[in-house]
């Protein structure tokens, strides 16, 4: 009975590995990472130089005196 259990576990691991290789598991993982790490790339963070072409993110304000986000 133990041999059958081990055999089934090995078969399950091999099957899932093969499915990842054939199914583009890396592409799916990269897409998931890109989606989760996506942010508003056009805005500037704290103390970054800002202008009309490179505005501060919504939660920061561009100082007219220093031209920096705060």
Curated annotation (Swiss-Prot):
Q: Where in or outside the cell is it found?
A: Secreted
Positions bearing 4-hydroxyproline: 49
Where does the UniProt annotation place the signal sequence? 1-19
**Main localization (coarse):** secreted
Record has DNA damage as a keyword: no
Family in the record: Belongs to the conotoxin O2 superfamily.
What domain notes does the record hold?
The presence of a 'disulfide through disulfide knot' structurally defines this protein as a knottin.
Q: What is this protein called?
A: TxMEKL-P2
Instruction: List the source organism.
Output: Conus textile
- Lineage from the top down? Eukaryota, Metazoa, Spiralia, Lophotrochozoa, Mollusca
């Amino acid at each position: 009975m133990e041999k059958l259990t081990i055999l089934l576990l090995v078969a399950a691991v091999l099957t899932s590995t093969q499915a990842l290789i054939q199914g583009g598991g890396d592409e799916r993982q990269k897409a998931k990472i890109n989606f989760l790490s996506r942010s508003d790339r056009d805005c500037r963070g704290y103390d970054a130089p800002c202008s009309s072409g490179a505005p501060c993110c919504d939660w920061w304000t561009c100082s007219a005196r220093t031209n920096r986000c705060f």
